[in-house]
Amino acid sequence: YLDDALIKKIVDTYPFYAKVMIPANTYANQDKSVNTVAVMAQWVCAAEVDEELIYTLTKALWEPGFHVLRKKEGKPEPAPAGAEIMAQAHAKGKDVTLDTALAGMAIPLHPGAERYYREKGLIK
């Protein structure tokens, strides 16, 4: 268990960490939620990758129906958001949310990703 003061000290010293909560009963004999720190998942690309491409990929990660992955009865069917697919595919995938997308971000955002997050109000 890490108290809030220690978590703040760790995150301030090592900005690639973010505060997270492990829900009760995640592990055997763990009947209470536990606050701790973790390294969050980050999507990384080279700086020279096209801005519009990275903007589009970032948008597809968060917005359902933005892209088409499959056909149903011969017609294109809009796919769920990439984050929604991750939530179905992996237990930690449900923790990938737009609200926490920038938590623990210790490297500069690509201009395309920055544009998307600015549009969504995550960056002022």
Give names to the regions the model predicted.
Residues 42-48, 98-107:
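Second-shell loop/turn segments in exported
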Residues 52-60:
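Short amphipathic alpha-helical coupling segments at ligand-binding clamshell hinges
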Residues 123-124:
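Short, solvent-exposed mixed-charge patches
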Residues 110:
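ATP/nucleoside-binding phosphotransfer catalytic cores, i.e., glycine-rich phosphate-binding loops
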Residues 57, 113-117:
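Residue-level signal for nonpolar/aromatic packing positions in well-ordered secondary structure
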Residues 1-44, 49:
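Pocket-lining segment of extracytoplasmic ligand-binding domains
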Residues 48-50, 62-63:
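Short Gly/Pro-enriched loop/turn and capping motifs at secondary-structure junctions
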